[in-house]
Every structure is written in C-alpha cells, then in structure tokens.
Amino acid sequence: MNKMPVLFVGHGSPMNALDAENPFNQGFRRIVQKFARPKAILMISAHWYGNRLQVTSGERPEMIYDFYGFPAALSQVQYPAPGSPELAGLVRSLLQPEKVEMDPERGFDHGAWAVLKHLYPEADIPVVQLSLNLMQPAQWHFDLAKKLAPLREQGVLVVGSGNVVHNLRAMRREPAAGYEWAIDFRNAVNRALAAQDNDTLVHYERLREAAALSVPSPEHYLPLLYTTALREPQDDMEIFNDELAFGSISMTSVLIG
C-alpha cells in the first residue's frame, strides 16, 4: 500500500455541515479524490481538549452536538461511522511513554463530523479521535505527533481539524474581507508551510500581534501541527480552501503527501 497523506482541514462554522454545495465542502470532496481510500481515520479536533491525552475507543461512537444557538436541523445531523478499538490501542502504544486514556463513551464532536460528512459521506470508514492536552506547549504537540508516523504506512489518514485563524470575538457577520492581521498571519503560516519552516509553525507566537489576534487560544491552531509534524522532505504539499470567513476565521486547509 502507498503511504497515506496527512490532512489539515479548516472546519469553520458548524453550519457548513448543512450546506453540501458551499465552496469549502466542494474543496473537501475534490481533495479526497487525490489519494486512496483510507482503512481508518485518526482525527485530532479543536473541540476535544483538556489536561490529559484521551482516545475514543468505543465501537459505535455517538454524536456530540457541542454548540448552541444554531438551527435544530444541525442537532439532527448523523454521522454513524464505526469506531476502532484496535486503532485506539495502536495510537496509545505509539504515543508511549505518554499516558493515553481509552474513553469508550466519548463520541464525535462537530470538529470531526461536520467535515467527515463531506470528506466521506458514506460514514463507513472507522474513525478514532485523539484529544489535545492544552497543558502542554506547541513544541510538545509537534513532537508527540511525530510518533504517529507509522500510521501513514498502515492506511490510516491522520486529519487535524481546526482553523489557522480563529477569533470569534472579532467575527463580522456581513460578507467582508479578512482583517489585515488575519491575512498577515494566514500568509505567514502559508509561507512557512511552503518552506517547510516548522520552527515558525511551532513558535507562531513570534509573529506577535498578528498571532495574538489570530490565535487567542491554541486549540484551533494545534491540530495543524499534528499534520505538519508528519511531513517528510519528499512530500508534496497543497493548500486549498484558502479563504477567510467572517473576517477572522480562516478556512485554510492543507494536504501533505
């Protein structure tokens, strides 16, 4: 089997789950045509974080509707993909000596199902989620992610789901171009991706004001590092869906491999 690529997806608003024809979801459908169907998916979502590492280990994860103030239809979306206790155990083994707790009760949050619904709408590929330990710095996450490299050889698609720029307080509801600071930060990250400049990607706070405004909290940025950490020197890289929504939410997505 050819080595699987790795993917980072900008998931944006949960409402994207309901609009199959918006340009971002069209981008997701286009990108998965570029590589083989995975045997399983490991998802690192911005919406599962805490002070420790956990992995979903149930055979039939339920849906988590972790939002409020949205139409009722959004809380009726189903993505009945199976879990994979086997993959969960493999992830725990690969990440040793870090302790990873198996969670058989945890379901899929919208950072996972809202994009998987458009990447693989049949919901027939096993999915496991790995949580983010926000007690640890970005370098720790990057180094941890490197341990997941063997998954690429085993047909597992590693997907980080977040947003490079994610500032909810600065959102503008009317159609508008991105803020200058959001554009600057997004462009700096894109340049670092093109140059394989992992130092800049990990130490994004060195971008100063643009970083402080674009990443007011780290959970939406960190999933990007789980993708870039698995990049090898010969891997191709494609940036897609490279737009800003509501002025301060970047939909920038990246395929590596």
Can you name each region flagged by the protein language model?
Residues M1-E98:
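A short aromatic-anchored loop/beta-hairpin motif
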Residues L7-F8, D66-A72, P121-V128, V202-H203:
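Short, basic/glycine-rich phosphate-binding loops at helix/coil junctions
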Residues A88-F142:
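Internal, conserved structured core segments that host functional sites
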Residues S93, P97, I125-P126, Q136, ...:
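Surface-exposed, charge/polar-rich loops and edge strands
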